Amino acid sequence: MPCRPTMTTPWEAAPPLPAMPRPATPQRSMSMLHHVGHAAPVSADRAPLLRRLSTDQQSTEKPLLREFSVDVEETFQRLLEQEDTDGDMQISISDRGPKSITLKTVKGTTAEVRGTYMLASLLQELAIAKDRGERHMVIREAQLAEDPIHRLSRMIRTMFWDNLTRRIDAEGLEKVLLDPKNRSSHRRQLLYVPENEPDMLAYYRRVAQERPDLKLDVEALPTHFTPEYVRDLNQRPGLLAIAMEKQVDELTGAVDMKGIPFVVPGARFNELYNWDSYFIALGLLEDGRLDLAKGPVDHFVFEIEHYHKIMNGNRSYYLLRSQPPFLTDFTRRVYARLVADEPSRDHKPWLKRALCAAIKEYRTVWMSEPRWDPATGLSRYHPEGLGVPPETEASHFTNLLRPYAEKYRCSVNEFTRMYDHGQVHEPELDEYFRHDRAVRESGHDTSYRVERRCANLATIDLQALLYKYEVDIAELIRDEFDDDLDGEHSAVWFERAAFRQRQVDTYLWNEGKGLYFDYDLC
């Protein structure tokens, strides 16, 4: 029989993989007949690996040291017409073009750029220049031959983070209000602000008056809201306000407000997300962007205080739904970097506020019914809600709902309206959407592992995350607050972690398979 393992968490290091044999001479695709050596570095600390190179029969310039002088629009169109044979606005190995283009160098000669990768890099550089409104540009050949991993990392660091950064204030509202998921007929933009934040309400109403182009309506959100209230908001979905900071004008002394920046996932997801933000922050901290990594922690504290949970995202249709909990580890990582980067400042007040918010979230969200199961002491994903989730694409539930629409002899849209407002009762459909909401809260959407049963499952990942919460809280109270945080003591939290481990071993451990499995509470 296998030994009974102790409960592990995702943060514990896995054993190292065995070293793989490495080829003596790396093979690279070249269009040169002679050895050209390594590429010139794109930056001082990131030298690119060689890619497929360009050729030039009219110049003695060394490859990768050349610079091309190009007309942005003309070259962009010529490159697409010649190389993008499948019309997807990209250049890939699927395209059937000649994989070669001739460009002028800054010295007046011509050079041929060859190969899928270099042409794709050229297209990307031209697209970036077009977005910036540039008509002419100089491109270094080294940019086009840059190692793809270095290139991607550099572009994330220098472009993508900033392009995906949002702020909910006068300067940032136009960009962040956009919601591709909004299928309502309401054409004006809506911003919901907690009713107990009068300064924020006044600020946003002033912005709405001063910026009629935003077509913005600002509404106060009550302190407490029911599933019925949130369902009715789905007819007028909007953005939910999050944390702001007050700023004082040094010249006039006037007090104004500014949104705290955060990074969005992008595409259809143009708002602050819960566990997305944690993993985004890991990259931000790696790239030295503490300013952007800290913001979501402040926003999550605000959400717990005003919306009673860290929401799936800060749109009105997410008001009742959370996501996998990462706040304690998130806080620890940011706090450690704050202390390292600004050792002369006292960061304990910030840590205390975040830790107290995490304790509140732990108790009121994950250790309260319906998410908490009193019989086992374990927790599950189980958000409240009524009706069909409105943020999905229009046809997402069509096949599911069509038989019900036929039963009531109406269109799918009409049946959805009746079902959402309780005019028809379908227990099987209620059960389906109970689990569907839980799947979305779990972050596992979509997965056959949890499909149609998620609200019944004490999943191993959620137990591990809450175990991490309990240990994190205990260690921070002990190490940072002399074992007393407003009456909270580490021993109690360590015991909670030990209890969870015992319950997980009891209910989720499969002795025969030697693995932990989700436990069906029903």
At which residue positions do the language-model features occur?
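Acidic, mature catalytic/reactive cores of soluble proteins
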Residues: M1-C522
